[in-house]
């Protein structure tokens, strides 16, 4: 027991005292001589350095994402101002598409675009010239023929191609590819009401 009493009075064998072995929130490798009174001084010194820094320039700030240059933004605005988007629906299809009427020069390119949109379920049958006359959209599974119709400003459903192209673009609200059996009653001057 004399050895244990001698160990209590003598310094520890490893040379570390209680303060050296205490767990603190300091970073690893920081000196143990730094006390809690020294940390606020360092913090104040670092804070004083940042007080003199200038704020970032207005160009360095991120305004929107993704970053788009001004000329590209303006081009997008101009394109959207000229665009005449209308919804396109197919009888029996659970989804709609949009088509830009201003991007097409006439009925034939519009019908080709409609076929391209719904190529997975529709095929083109018949064949006329390049004007799109005589072509019909046919369902691949059932064989039903579809006729392109549109709703005008007055809410009347009319056949696509019954009016001049410019008048069609101005008055079209939406396009519907109807089954030809349902579109029998549609005519250029008759309303569906």
UniProtKB/Swiss-Prot annotation:
Residues 21-36 have a biased composition (Low complexity). InterPro entries: AUX/IAA_dom (IPR033389), AUX_IAA (IPR003311), PB1-like (IPR053793). It comes from the Eukaryota. Residues 1-66 are annotated as: Disordered. The keyword Transcription applies. Highly expressed in roots. Expressed in seedlings. A motif (EAR-like (transcriptional repression)) lies at residues 23-27. Induction: Not induced by auxin. Pfam families: AUX_IAA. The keyword Cell inner membrane does not apply. Residues 39-53 have a biased composition (Basic and acidic residues). Residues 83-191 form the PB1 domain. GO terms for cellular component: nucleus. Homodimers and heterodimers. Aux/IAA proteins are short-lived transcriptional factors that function as repressors of early auxin response genes at low auxin concentrations. Belongs to the Aux/IAA family. This is Auxin-responsive protein IAA23. The gene is IAA23.
């Amino acid at each position: 027991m004399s050895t244990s009493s001698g160990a209590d009075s003598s310094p520890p064998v490893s040379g570390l005292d209680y303060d050296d072995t205490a767990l603190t929130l300091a970073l690893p490798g920081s000196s143990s001589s730094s006390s809690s009174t020294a940390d606020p001084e360092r913090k104040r010194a670092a804070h004083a350095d940042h007080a003199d820094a200038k704020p970032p320039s207005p160009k360095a700030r991120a305004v929107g994402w993704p970053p788009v240059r001004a000329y590209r933004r303006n081009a997008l605005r101009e394109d959207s101002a000229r665009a005449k988007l209308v919804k396109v629906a197919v009888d029996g299809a659970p989804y709609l598409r949009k088509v830009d009427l201003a991007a097409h020069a006439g009925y034939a390119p519009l019908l080709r675009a409609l076929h391209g949109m719904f190529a997975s379920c529709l095929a083109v049958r018949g064949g006329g010239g390049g004007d799109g006359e005589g072509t019909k959209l046919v369902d691949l599974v059932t064989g039903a023929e579809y006729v392109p119709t549109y709703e005008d400003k007055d809410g009347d459903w009319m056949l696509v191609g019954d009016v001049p192209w410019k008048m069609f673009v101005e008055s079209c609200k939406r396009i519907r590819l109807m089954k030809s059996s349902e579109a029998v009653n549609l005519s250029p001057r008759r309303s569906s009401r």
